């Protein structure tokens, strides 16, 4: 699998962002509300106009059609859109093991999305994205609506999968404890720059 490289990314207040994420590495991002964390992920996934570029392996973002890039570098936003009624219709392929690991029952695939809680939708959004087999993953606080037990359950399922698929991951993390559990490296947004912080103290 290929690594993800950010070259001179500029979006919103952020300027000249350079970052390399190795295959299988989780790089956590943090910073105050409005600092640009989500906008940076949207720029990398080609969902928002920006300066600079991103690369996945040797392929530059602007060298392929936007929809093809977004199929490889996939973002799970804090709030996802749902186009179909049933859970199963949102999955590119059946993922019963993933649904079970995240606390869903055998009948979940036939459920209407409208009956799911915000936390269940957040978990389902992650399963939906992984069912499309992306080559890089951008996660915008994917556990923000989950309690501690469910958060740990999601992490225990997701981390081995990231290592197995060797996915480079940018993860906007929810709190310092989570960063210490997950991050290979941690960058805090300060002003217009990324400042590397120690992961474990």
Predicted regions mapped to residue ranges:
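Helix-to-loop junction immediately C-terminal to a conserved catalytic motif
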Residues: 45
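ABC ATPase NBD coupling module
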Residues: 60-74
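Q-loop/switch helix immediately C-terminal to the Walker
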Residues: 72, 79-98
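Conserved ABC ATPase signature
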Residues: 112-116, 120
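Hydrophobic anchor residue at the start of the ABC signature
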Residues: 126
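Catalytic Walker B motif of ABC-type/P-loop ATPase nucleotide-binding domains
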Residues: 137-141
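H-loop/switch region of ABC-family ATPase nucleotide-binding domains
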Residues: 172-174
């Amino acid at each position: 699998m290929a690594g993800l490289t950010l070259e001179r990314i500029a979006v919103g207040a952020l300027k000249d962002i350079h970052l390399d994420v190795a295959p299988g590495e989780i790089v956590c991002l943090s910073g105050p509300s409005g600092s640009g964390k989500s906008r940076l992920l949207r720029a990398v996934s080609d969902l928002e106009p920006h300066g600079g570029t991103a690369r996945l392996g040797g392929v530059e973002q602007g060298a392929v059609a936007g929809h093809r890039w977004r199929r490889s570098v996939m973002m799970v936003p804090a709030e996802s859109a749902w186009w179909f009624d049933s859970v199963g219709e949102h999955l590119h392929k059946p993922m019963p093991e993933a649904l079970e690991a995240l606390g869903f029952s055998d009948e979940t695939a036939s459920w209407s999305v409208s009956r799911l809680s915000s936390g269940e939708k957040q978990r389902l959004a992650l399963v939906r994205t992984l069912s499309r087999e992306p080559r890089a993953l951008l996660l915008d606080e994917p556990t923000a609506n989950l309690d501690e037990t469910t958060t740990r359950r999601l992490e225990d399922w997701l981390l081995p999968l990231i290592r197995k698929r060797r996915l480079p991951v940018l993860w906007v993390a929810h709190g310092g404890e989570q960063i210490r559990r997950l991050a290979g490296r941690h960058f805090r947004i300060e002003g217009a720059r990324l400042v590397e912080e120690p992961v474990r103290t």
